[in-house]
UniProtKB/Swiss-Prot annotation:
Keyword Acyltransferase set for record: no
Species lineage: Bacteria, Pseudomonadati, Pseudomonadota, Gammaproteobacteria, Pseudomonadales
Region (Ribokinase): 1-318
Species the sequence originates in: Pseudomonas aeruginosa (strain UCBPP-PA14)
Stated name of the protein: Bifunctional protein HldE
GO cellular component: cytosol
GO biological process: ADP-L-glycero-beta-D-manno-heptose biosynthetic process
Catalytic residues as annotated in Swiss-Prot or TrEMBL: 263
Region named Cytidylyltransferase: 343-474
rRNA-binding keyword on record: no
Amino acid sequence: MKLSMPRFDQAPVLVVGDVMLDRYWHGATSRISPEAPVPVVRVEQHEDRPGGAANVALNIAALGAQALLVGVTGRDEAADSLANSLKAAGVDARFQRIDSQPTIVKLRVMSRHQQLLRVDFEEPFRTDAAALAVDVESLLAKVKVLVLSDYGKGALQNHQVLIQAARARNIPVLADPKGKDFAIYRGASLITPNLSEFETIVGRCADEAELVAKGQELMSELDLGALLVTRGEHGMTLLRHGQPALHLPARAREVFDVTGAGDTVISTLAAALAAGEELPSAVGLANLAAGIVVGKLGTAAISAPELRRAVQREQGSERGVLGLEQLLLAIEDARAHGEKIVFTNGCFDILHAGHVTYLEQARAQGDRLIVGVNDDASVTRLKGVGRPINSVDRRMAVLAGLGAVDWVVSFAEDTPERLLEQVRPDVLVKGGDYGVEQVVGAQIVKAYGGEVRVLGLVENSSTTAIVEKIRQKG
């Protein structure tokens, strides 16, 4: 799936749901308490982060989209901390504050990046559902997507009023569901349960086929536009009416903490859809975002630059013509998997059998082959007027179609030395009958410990000779 970064700055999203404060106490542990067999934590640092629906809004704002938030809090220090954090992040938060109840707080005691204890300060909110609905309806005209972030804490009490109000304005409704009754989300455009939540409703699924069948049945029963089941290390599955299931593998490189991963999925989905992305592309972006956030500790947001880098990395993982930035990310990923990078370069004006044989031999020197291609101006300087015969785009497209070639990139200079300094291949390969020291860029590669190898060329195979022969016959 080809992904691109949306224009998030043109994506207003309204989030409604259970806001909470995620509070972290960090400290050192060096002894066991004499009072009970538990570690003693000497608190050295504390931090507050928006959680629940507030984290969804924070993620949307971090992507550069416009985030509006409606939720319920107490009238206390925790609510003030939430409001200040959200304002600093650019979230337009509208809280219904209740004097008689505390803001929901999840306190986590941490030591050496490990969670030792979680303490919850909460009681279900008794909200004025009608007043909250009025607040939501007054904001719908300003947004392109509505998100219901439901943690079952009481902020959302009349889901259908909100869903129908949005549908009347043709505004998509995304819901992150909780509980044992998904009927309250009837008519939503998309719901995003995790596998455990999904199986609580439909029963255990023995395999993907059963998951798809039960999901399609649930969609029809509840008049849902689509269903996205997040499946942890197995990725996620998107179901739509009349379309085959779309299974996306997990993209996490390292997993430190799954806290807030569901928030990241629905926030990225909402922002992407509000920016005009089609649903499959939005799901692809959400999958990448989830892979990033589980590599962070605690409740965390991802930024637009982080997601853009992941998109570029995803594009770079595919074979073909790449820009330099995408190529460097692809190389980084390949090296993370222990792959050896081989580089060669040339004009490749008219591809012939000698080129193909040479590139196959070059590919055999490692795991990934990069071909650097002179752009049109540099070919003219090197080969003279009338060259190249084929433009750089055409030359790169042909090279990218060869099985031996992984990535193709162009360069504007007469030699690839500047490109070599950035790519830093493990092996530099050149065809010819000269010594290693005569290879352009050899000193650069050898200076950082790389290898330089010279391969023999196929006899009677020359682009210049082919061009001359064509001219003589023409």
